[in-house]
Amino acid sequence: MAILKWVFWLTIWAVVAAFFHYTLPQVDIVRVTDTYEKRIDFGNNSMFWSKAGVGNNTALGNRDVFFIQTRRAKGDVMVYRNEDTGWGWPPYFKFDTTNLQAEASDLKSSSGSPQYVALKHYGWRNEFFSIFPNATSMWVVDGPNASKGIPFANIIILTLFAAMVYAIWVRWRRFKRSRIDPTVERIEDDFAERQNRFSSWMKSRSKK
C-alpha cells in the first residue's frame, strides 16, 4: 500500500512538473537561419498545436503554419512554430504572428556573420511526434553567451502555486486531525471492542 501511495504521488507531481515545463516561457539564444510557411495536416498530435487564429476557419483539418529555423551557439538546430495563441491556452494572448515572422526574417544571418537573438517560447520539440515549441517574442542580443534575463514570470507563478499547495496541505492536515482521525479511532476502538466481545463469547462457549 505504501508503494502504491508513493507511485501515485510521484505520478501526480511528474504530471504537474511536465505541465509547467511545457507551459511556462523559456528563452533560447539562437541564430535565425531561415523562415518559412508550411501546410500542416493535424492528426493525433493536434493538442500540441494552437487553435486556428482569429479570423480563420476553425473547421479545417489543416492550415498554413509559420516556422522559424535556428541554430544554437553549440551548433545544434532548433525549429520553432510561430502561431497565435489568441484567447486560448496557454494564456499568452499572442496575436502578432505575422509581425513576429517578419521580424525573424529580418534577423536571419549566416555562420560567417552571425546575429544572435534571444527567442522566448513555450512547449517542446519532439521529432518523433512532430511537435514544435511556439515562439512568442524575440530580441537582439550581443552574442551567444548573452544573458537570458531573470524569469520573473516563472518565479512568481511557481511561488504562487507553491503557496497555494502549502495552504491546501495545511487545511487538509487540520481537517484530517480534527475530523477524520477521531472518526477512524472510534471505528477502530468499536471494532476492537466487538472483537473482544466475540472472543469472550467464543471462550465461554468452549468451556460449556
Language-model regions, residue ranges each:
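Hydrophobic secretory-pathway targeting helix
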Residues: M1-D34, A153
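Glycine-rich loops and low-complexity Gly/Arg-rich segments
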Residues: Y92-K94, A104-L107, D142-A146, F161-Y166
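Extended, hydrophilic extramembrane loops/domains of integral membrane proteins
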Residues: E103-N145
